[in-house]
Regions:
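C-terminal motif of bacterial Sec signal peptides marking the signal peptidase cleavage site
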Residues: 23-27
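Bacterial N-terminal signal peptides that target proteins for export
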Residues: 2-17
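A Zn2+-metalloprotease active-site environment signal
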Residues: 15-16, 28-269
């Protein structure tokens, strides 16, 4: 009885390479609004389940804000953004977490959105709040979390194929280890980080469209990001090629370029 397939060592790396290519082709899809080609090897259902699981853990370990007016404000603006996103399959939820030292927000797969109270020192209007929420919702709408998971899987598969290929070629172990270490650094800087910057820029672009569709002025987004950049300019930033986010100057320049597109969707509420 045949229990498996034997691949000669010199051919196994070719098989792995073909398997990686096949997986990439099978997972090709297109991001909304931008039309960017993506590779997604995670199902929407699995991605959303991971998002719900992560959100439950955050709720267990974080304290929610008790200010009813603040919670209602975030929920009202968030629901307008969610309506513009047009994903009725998402279980939208907008929660404010009490942490005045954290100026951050997130949207997990499936529509679970969190905003930390520390962010409100920079938010001067509902348009500012819509800027933040629409950016985070855009990450979920474009399935950036699933894309990142897929990139990690592809990087692992590429490393395995390289390891098998080096062994098949009889490369000495010391040289093989050096090559693998170089591959790890190269995949991080050359593949994973740049994609993260692409996703951030894409979330800015889609976010402007979403806030415009929801009736918030996309022009105000520029002022918010400029103000936010000024407030944190004293904090050291890594070089852009080592950062998961674009530099503040690059982000603001991109937003200026995206605004004409977003204006086409804007009707004042």
């Amino acid at each position: 009885m045949v229990t498996g397939i034997f691949l000669p060592p010199r051919n196994s790396w070719r098989f792995l390479a073909l398997a990686v290519v096949a997986a990439v082709l099978a997972g090709c899809t297109t991001a909304p609004y931008t039309g960017r080609q993506q590779v997604l090897m995670v199902s929407p259902e699995r991605e959303q389940a991971l998002g719900y699981q992560a959100f439950s853990q955050i709720e267990r370990t974080s304290r929610q804000a008790q200010d009813p007016a603040l919670r209602a404000r975030v929920r009202e603006v968030g629901e307008r953004i969610a309506k513009a996103a047009d994903r009725p399959d998402y279980h939208w939820e907008f929660v404010v977490f009490q942490d005045d030292k954290t100026a951050n927000a997130f949207c997990l797969p499936g529509g679970k959105v969190g905003v930390y109270t520390g962010l409100f020192k920079y938010i001067k209007s509902d348009d500012d709040l819509a800027t933040v929420l629409s950016h985070e919702v855009a990450h979920a709408l474009a399935r950036h979390a699933g894309e990142r998971l897929s990139q990690g899987r592809l990087a692992q598969a590429g490393g395995l194929a390289l390891n098998v290929g080096l062994a098949a070629l009889g490369v000495p172990s010391v040289a093989s280890q050096a090559a693998m270490q170089g591959y790890g650094l190269g995949s991080q800087v050359g593949i994973l980080l740049p994609y993260s910057r692409v996703q951030e820029s894409e979330a800015d672009r889609i976010g402007l469209i979403l806030m415009a569709k929801a009736g918030y002025d996309p022009e105000k987004a520029l002022g918010f990001w400029e103000r936010f950049a000024t407030a944190k300019k004293d904090k050291a930033q890594p070089p852009q090629f080592l950062s998961t986010h674009p530099t503040d100057a690059a982000r603001i320049q991109s937003i200026r370029a995206f605004l004409p597109e977003a204006r086409q969707y804007y009707t004042a509420r």
